[in-house]
Amino acid sequence: MANHKSAEKRARQTIKRTERNRFYRTRLKNITKAVRVAVEAKDLNAANEALKVANKSIHSFVSRGFLKKQTAARRVSRLAQLVNTLKAA
């Protein structure tokens, strides 16, 4: 239990940030999984659509400060690589 007003505020902020980060983390996992599932099913159209959604979402996470720019670039690059394996096959 916080004894100071500022500590109470920090506790509230921590709860808010934790919930927000959990939401972003879950969303990131789900959009990544959608791309991987489409690739495993060998569905090029679905994989491209999922990649487009993933790209947009991941870069929006950067603008919100959830991910660093390079981390987002790496994740998008790896997903694009996965989708390109379908095009090559």
Swiss-Prot record:
Q: In Gene Ontology terms, what is one molecular function of this protein?
A: small ribosomal subunit rRNA binding
Q: Name one GO biological process term.
A: translation
**Keywords annotated in UniProt:** Ribonucleoprotein, Ribosomal protein, RNA-binding, rRNA-binding
Q: Does the keyword Magnesium apply?
A: no
Give the region (Disordered) as residue ranges: 1-20
Query: What GO cellular-component annotations does this UniProt entry give?
Result: cytosol; small ribosomal subunit
Do you know which Pfam families this protein is assigned to? Ribosomal_S20p
What this chain does, per the record?
A: Binds directly to 16S ribosomal RNA.
Similarity comment: family membership: Belongs to the bacterial ribosomal protein bS20 family.
The name on file for this protein is Small ribosomal subunit protein bS20
The scientific name of the source species is Campylobacter concisus (strain 13826)
Classification from the root reads: Bacteria, Pseudomonadati, Campylobacterota, Epsilonproteobacteria, Campylobacterales
Gene expressing this chain: rpsT
